Amino acid sequence: NTFKRVDWVCQTAGEIENKIRALNPKYGAFTYLGEERIKLFSASAKKNNSSVEPGLIVINKEGSLEVGCKDSGLLEIETLQMPGKRIISSKEFVRGYKSTLSKNLKFS
């Protein structure tokens, strides 16, 4: 199970993107938001020099989630799944969980 878990501190955005693609759809890579296990089904690495701390969640100007990674890069989350829910876009997640998304919220 540990090979399916995303390690934001030790993996680059490109490595995490490849892991998510490789494990989709049968297994799904995952991360934690607090106590909740979140499955990640699609994402894309962004090639910018970000000052975003690994694991830190930010909302981009399009309203999608981006997460800081090891290489000072960002990974844009495209689709994800909360426990017991259907797969949704990160934009839907942002709209539905806006109250949960506070400053300095991190995936672990």
Annotate each PLM feature:
Residues 7-108:
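An anion-binding loop in the catalytic cleft
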